[in-house]
Amino acid sequence: MSSAINFQIKRTYVQAKRGELVMGEPDIKLARIDNRLIHGQVATQWNGTLGTNLILVANDEVAGNKMRQGLMDMAAPSGVATRYFTLQKTIEVIHKASASQHIFLVAENPEDVLTLVKGGVPIKKVNIGNMHMAEGKRQVATSVAVDDKDVAAFRELQELGVTLEIRRVPTTPVEDISKLFE
């Protein structure tokens, strides 16, 4: 057993002995990359399919922009909570999530997701939804345009064991991710 795992087991045991709350892994149903963050597709189709009760937007700019948060709150389904955290705050608090929180995590780009994963956020699967065309990007799927920086982040996510899929909405087929690396 690795020393890191041994340390974690010992730390958890000590916390339990002290009567401290030991948090489990957060229930992140899916992480999605979407330039638009929360909008109609995310709020209705994805959230409905996933059965989540919390949409967590991990984005440094939006975390401090009450106007954008308000607009996204209008798109969120009733009964579904929204949270807007910086990447660092997401890393710091995600393991404090209640077992009753079923989380749909939304980030703006693959670099942000990579930051979260490297920071210890247990993201197992990333849905690549909307990455709009911009200068220096190339279209690789219906709604996905990437540049070299995006491709490097996707490669590293794969190397870290994160599953990637390209799919706009839950009712459409998954597109071939090899397109990302061409």
Predicted regions span which residues?
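A general structural motif
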Residues: 34-39, 86, 146-147
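Long, hydrophobic N-terminal alpha-helical segment
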Residues: 19-20, 24-76, 81
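Short basic, glycine-rich beta-strand/loop surfaces that mediate nucleic-acid
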Residues: 65, 71-75, 79-83, 93-106, ...
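Glycine-rich, aromatic-bearing surface loops/beta-hairpins
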Residues: 119, 124-182
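Short, Lys/Arg-enriched N-terminal segments with co-localized hydrophobic residues
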Residues: 3-22
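Ordered, amphipathic secondary-structure segments that act as subunit-interaction surfaces
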Residues: 84-129
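Structural motif
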Residues: 27-31, 53-56, 81-83, 102-105, ...
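Short, ordered loop/turn segments at secondary-structure junctions
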Residues: 59-62, 87-90, 110, 129-133, ...
